[in-house]
């Protein structure tokens, strides 16, 4: 029984082509308008479970900041620095409204669903990724996740106020059992994912496998990190971009 967990799906287009490669798929999206689009797109897939909740460290209610570009919406209010920086591209990170959404503890939810192993864990929840992953400690410690593809923020950055999503936190949480393979930006496609072009001591490093990002000079403080369970075969996750 192969399982995909998809946290922060938005309209679900990032992974739609992968759903039929898994026996069960769990999709989480708090924005009610985006959730309605998910229902229309995936209602015919009986193996796909759609959940209209934000993944968090607790079950209940929380404020949710809806941005002009819905992909930037978050449980955290975008920081002034992030909003101003984003304006150089467009005004998509500007908050247009604040709503109340349901929240769940993801680790508890998946245990209640009797999920025994997650083949691919995909998380893009705008600053809450580390907080959510901490609820999965039982899965992590017992090596019950094969591959992880997670939005990550650079150390020292605060993109969403009050949310710590720094790379060093992921490294500490996953370090013993999981290997950091590479970081990517872009969209899902054929071939291996491309790493961010980074500078270390002024030199451009373009190798796909980068083991240490502590000295990265990354203009964009957001990227997506790919982690694999030690000894687990390379799978779909290694080809993903976001």
Predicted ranges, named:
Residues 1-242:
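Phosphate/nucleotide-binding beta-alpha loop and adjacent structural elements of enzyme active sites
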